[in-house]
Design a protein with these regions (language model features):
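Extracytoplasmic
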Residues: 591, 731-968
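Active-site-adjacent helix/loop segment of glycosyltransferases
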Residues: 206-301
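Active-site lumenal/periplasmic loops and adjacent helix-entry segments of GT-C-fold
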Residues: 379-504, 509
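Membrane-helix boundary/interfacial segments in multi-pass membrane proteins
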Residues: 389-398, 412, 416, 485-497, ...
């Protein structure tokens, strides 16, 4: 046997030098050495010359391994008397001294063996005298044609020394008879990177010859990527590797298929890639989505190469595919291997799961206590099927109506306005679907679960940072009965309530976003949820996001993707408001615009979005001496306790955590003070700012997290500052918890009726009928809105309507009609009302100022409007109702409304917007679903100060030196 060693090099250096030295030490020397300079860089050429090969060939650029070996094989003159063998080596293939001797011996013993392969050791972890790590030792195929390494990353303890016949071996160190190489045509040029050796070995087996592994032969490899895929570390390289592997798999599937199967496979390439795309998202591998499509398209357009490969395989095959069944893996074996691999990876990456001690540590009792508080505070609402008051309206009159308002279309409340819906409309539609039989009932549920659910989020969030049960209880109570939440509940602010509930869960998911695609996607969904409920928080949260991206270190794609769902949801509204030159309107609160009294900035900074220091000034006003100063001192002391605990956190063993929390608190305060002084929307003619409570919810949560760090300073004695902190929170909450009993809350049980019963009854039979709602304004004007059917709802509210100050042609016409109705000198408007499908005119009570007072101008305007309506001969008086004075327009044909607002005018933009948003949200939800998929890699760095030791929601000693047993 004459052995021709073919050494292929792409770069010089230590690896190539080691390989050349190893060749010189072989106990069975090579007969001919041919070096191939495969587009090398650096000193490779001179190193190859120093090896004194028989020939040095240059490819002129990087070419596939098979082509480089072919070039070298053609140089060798075939001998009729000597059996030539080709030994394929790369620059990083350092064979052990006896490797070639054992490989040649295997070929000499078995004349039917054409290809033999060695064990491939990991050169980086190998130490002389110690067992090596087997990177590869034989290959096989699954029933579906996937490449399965028989041995991969296992310590060599002799457990595979009896292996012999296999389906295939890797190219690294492969020894192949030159005659077989020439007859079979070498490696398939259609597989330039992956599975070239496997495909060649399959053709060897189908030609009737054998492929064997030689356990005694060992070849080292550094993973340079010359004879196999390179060792990858970066995510970009992993994506490229997956694309190459997937392409090779699909290519071989097309080549190996029989009869009409190739046509069916070709037709299904792209559709199946789309299906697998969703599977990759569900498996938390979004980086592989592009590789799925790219691989499928590449194979779909490689029909010429596939045809040549199939023809060659037909000409070379001498035995049936069934003859390979003994060396292919059965489906049960494939499943067993994958199960073991996943379990090993899970233990390696995640470690042992630890309990949260949710029940043993008092977490359950804390949530039960908050639930009792919630039930007691909201007792007047027990039994309600809907609630009303403040910014509360029915969530929607029907689930179908709510979903019809999502995305883009005609905006209710205005005449002839087409535009994008607020993202909050989608939130309401999703929530309303939970109580589909009565969508508004979900608001009652939200009101009752707000306190315990936000407290649970804070408990879980704090559990990421400390094992101290009392600190977790402090955080849960502080967030659960926060002044901002209690005020939002009593003032009827659904967006603010939902924001307060979601914020702890947002930061909880955000802490794990760098480690898990599932957590990243959950963070993205919660980010979109919070910004949809409170757009005014978007700037602050974006600052937090940018800081996270900058601090997280090497691996940032998971953080970079967080704002994408929110951007998709807000995109149409952003473009519309920018086109109207009204960018600040993007920060307006969704839902009905409700004016509220101006709150002094110092009270906002103390954490109260409404005047009165959370009810303490009201409490002091009933005292004999009106102790306002004493009330202020009590509130200042209570807030001061939490602030002092937060400041102490700056001097704890983990000051960075407190520093970051206090920075977030400042962002929340700046947001709260800023939005309370800028008028974004209009309540009638009254400019109205966004509610400052959402910013204060963010500030309060951050302050509580900083305070938990301060409490932990005393370690096992932390129960004392925690109890003081809880007492301070209770002091702040006491007056607010009584608001539902003493008449300070505007939220009351509702009946889902917005309009008078007479109008609602008519609208139930004729949903297209319209109602003009007139309201006298504090400045003496009269506002008019055009409502359809049963009246406005939370879902039908639109910031595009409430923030628009310019009039469209249709709105100008409607304004003229409304002006004539409230003017005694105007026309009766009978024809115009009929043309618009208006069946009712409702004059509501005059609009009060933010102080709650009704101006003289508003009363005069109301009197003038009612006089004009009474005097209008085209209207029939219905009378006084619970909503105001009502008139009826007789003989109205409401079918004209469908012609005034044809759905066709909203297409195709509506379909495009809804489809895009649905696709992005669907993919994000797939990523967020907890399927148990393992992360491909972990980031090198965490956000400073927010370190944690476990992947799952486990108690973590992140307090530095807090090593004793968890205790209260």
């Amino acid at each position: 046997v004459r052995v021709v060693a073919i050494l292929v090099a792409r770069s010089g250096g230590d690896h190539l030098a080691t390989t050349i030295a190893a060749l010189a030490k072989q106990t069975r020397p090579v007969d001919v050495l041919i070096a191939v300079d495969n587009g090398s860089r650096g000193s490779a050429r001179s190193q190859l010359e120093d090896a004194r090969p028989a020939h040095i060939l240059s490819t002129g650029g990087a070419v596939p391994l098979g082509e480089a070996v072919d070039m070298a094989a053609r140089v060798v003159a075939a001998s009729p008397t000597v059996d030539d063998c080709l030994w394929i080596l790369g620059q990083d293939s350092a064979p052990q001294p006896t490797a070639l001797e054992h490989l040649v011996g295997a070929l000499e013993v078995s004349r039917s063996a054409v290809v033999v392969g060695p064990k491939q050791y990991d050169a980086q972890s190998f130490e002389a005298g110690s067992p090596g790590t087997i990177l590869e030792f034989g290959q096989s195929l699954s029933p579906r044609g996937q490449t399965i390494p028989l041995v991969e990353n296992e310590l060599d303890q002799g457990q595979y020394d009896t292996m012999s016949d296999v389906l295939a071996v890797g190219a690294n160190g492969m020894l192949v008879r030159e005659s077989a190489w020439r007859t079979l045509g070498g490696f398939d040029t259609g597989l330039p990177v992956v599975d070239d050796a496997l495909d060649f070995c399959v053709r060897v087996r189908l030609s009737g010859s054998l492929v064997q592994v030689v356990p005694a032969a060992v070849v080292m490899t550094h993973g340079d990527g010359v004879t196999a895929l390179p060792r990858v570390e970066r995510e970009r390289d992993r994506r490229r590797e997956f694309r190459q592997i997937r392409r090779a798999e699909l290519y071989r599937r097309m080549v190996y298929a029989r009869a009409l199967a190739p046509l069916l496979i070709w037709l299904s390439l792209v559709p199946w890639a789309v299906v697998r795309l969703f599977g990759q998202m569900l498996a938390k591998r979004p980086g592989l989505v592009g590789g799925e499509l790219s691989a499928a398209l590449s194979v779909a357009f490689s029909l010429g190469s596939i045809g040549r490969s199939r023809a060659r395989l037909r000409g070379q095959r001498r035995v049936s595919w069934a003859s390979l069944s003994g060396v292919r893996l059965a489906a049960t074996e494939v499943r067993r291997r994958r199960t073991l691999s996943r379990e090993a990876a899970r233990i390696r990456l995640h470690g042992e799961k630890r309990s949260l001690y949710f029940f043993a540590g008092g977490g359950a009792w804390t949530i039960v206590a908050l639930s009792v508080i919630s039930f007691a505070v909201l007792f007047p609402l027990v039994g309600a099927t809907s609630i009303a008051g403040g910014a509360l309206l029915p969530a929607g009159h029907s689930l179908a109506e709510m979903w019809s308002l999502v995305g883009y279309g005609w905006r209710p409340g205005s005449a002839g306005l087409i535009g994008p819906a607020d993202p909050f409309t989608l939130i309401l539609a999703l929530l309303g679907s939970l109580t589909w039989w009565q969508p508004s009932f979900v608001l009652v549920v939200i009101w009752f679960v707000a306190i315990p659910l936000s407290g649970l989020g804070a408990w879980m969030l704090t559990a990421r940072l400390t094992e101290r049960f009392v600190i977790r209880a402090f955080a849960a109570l502080s967030v659960g009965v926060a002044p901002t939440l209690l005020i939002a509940l009593s003032d009827g602010r659904p967006g603010a309530v939902l924001t307060h509930i979601a914020l702890p869960w947002l930061f909880l998911a955000g802490f794990r976003a760098a480690r898990s695609w599932s957590a990243s996607a959950t963070t993205a969904l919660l980010f979109a949820f919070v910004t949809a409920c409170s757009p005014s928080l978007a700037p602050a949260l974006l600052v937090v996001w940018v800081g996270s991206v900058l601090l997280t270190g090497r691996y940032v794609p998971r953080f970079l993707a967080i704002p994408i769902p929110a951007a998709i949801l807000f995109g149409p509204l952003i473009l519309t408001q920018l086109s109207l030159l009204n960018p600040l309107a993007l920060l307006a609160d969704p839902g009905p615009t409700v004016a509220s009294p101006t709150t002094p900035a110092w009270q906002v900074v103390l954490g109260f979005p409404t005047p009165g220091l959370g009810g303490w000034l009201d409490v002091s006003s009933v005292a004999p001496l009106g102790l306002n100063i004493a009330a202020g001192i009590v509130v200042l002391a209570a807030v001061g306790v939490i602030a002092v605990l937060a400041i102490v956190g700056l001097f704890s063993p983990h000051p960075i955590r407190a520093q970051l929390a206090l920075l977030v608190m400042l962002l929340g305060l700046v947001t709260a003070v800023g939005v309370s002084n800028i008028r974004f929307a209009f309540d009638g003619s009254v400019p109205t700012p966004a509610w400052s409570g959402s910013g204060l919810s963010l500030a309060w949560l951050a302050l509580v997290i900083a305070a938990t760090t301060g409490i932990s300073v005393l370690r096992r004695f932390s129960v004392y500052p925690a109890m003081v902190g809880m007492l301070a929170v209770v002091v702040l909450a006491v007056p607010l918890t009584a608001s539902f009993f003493i008449g300070r809350s505007v939220v009351v049980p509702g009946n889902d009726l917005v309009f008078p019963a007479y109008v609602s009854a008519q609208a139930a039979m004729n949903p297209d009928i319209r109602t003009i709602v007139l309201t006298a304004q504090p400045d003496g004007g009269v506002s008019a809105s055009l409502e359809r059917g049963l009246g406005p709802t939370l879902a039908s509210s639109s910031t595009l309507v409430s923030t628009t100050s310019s009039a469209s042609p249709a709105l100008s016409v409607f304004g003229d009609i409304a002006g004539n109705l409230v003017s005694t000198s105007g026309s009766d408007g009978n024809n115009e009302l009929r043309a618009m499908g208006v069946g009712f005119i409702l004059l509501t009570s005059p609009q009060a100022e933010t102080s709650g007072e009704i101006t003289v101008e508003a009363r005069d305007a109301d009197a003038r409007a009612s006089a004009a309506l009474f005097a209008n001969p085209a209207l029939q008086e219905v009378g006084v109702t619970s909503s105001g004075l009502l008139w009826r327009v007789p003989d109205v044909d409401s079918s004209v409304v469908a012609g005034l607002e044809p759905p066709a005018l909203t297409e195709p933009l509506r379909s495009i917007i809804i489809s895009t948003q649905a696709l992005v949200l669907f993919l994000t939800v797939l990523l967020a679903l907890p399927t148990g998929a393992l992360a491909e890699a972990r980031p090198r760095r965490e956000i400073p100060g927010l370190e944690e030791d476990f992947e799952d929601f486990a108690p973590v000693d992140a307090l530095g030196g807090d090593d004793d047993e968890p205790q209260n």
